[in-house]
Amino acid sequence: TDADFMEKIPGTILGNLGCLTARIRETAPKGRIVIMTPVERGDYVCIGDPGCQTMGSYRPQAGQRLCDIAEAIARSAEKAGLCVVDLHKNAGFTAESVVRFKRLRKEAGYHDYVYPGYVDVPYDWKRDPYPYPVEAVGMTFDGLHPSDEGNEAIAKLLAEKLQDIL
């Protein structure tokens, strides 16, 4: 909640952010803090450890949707007088754009599934190849980490904000 941020309650997303920004203000009182909201993500599979996976932000996790978290971060940061770059709303990362497809096996072999077609198709990291070949790269390489295209969108919004505040 906004109160978590203002009261710096550790253990919550907003509370932790409140603690972090307070510490930055302590150590750099003249500095300007820019908060960037999180972008949408797809199903993430770590290329170095394919057993490390997380589902995309198209589904709530722990009862929370990423869009609601991003909105709360932006609202709390703005109330605290911080500069906000709302990547979630403005960077163009969507469930459809984070990756072009996810290559998964179904009975008849492998198929390139576009969102939302892949959400209920299981990925078995012990026997299937990595599901994001180079041609699957969209706004991210792997459903989580921004690609050149994703970084360009983020950089553009950040540059605009920095021009406004400098």
Where are these regions (language model features)?
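Alpha-helical cap/lid subdomain in secreted, periplasmic
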Residues: 1-152, 156-165
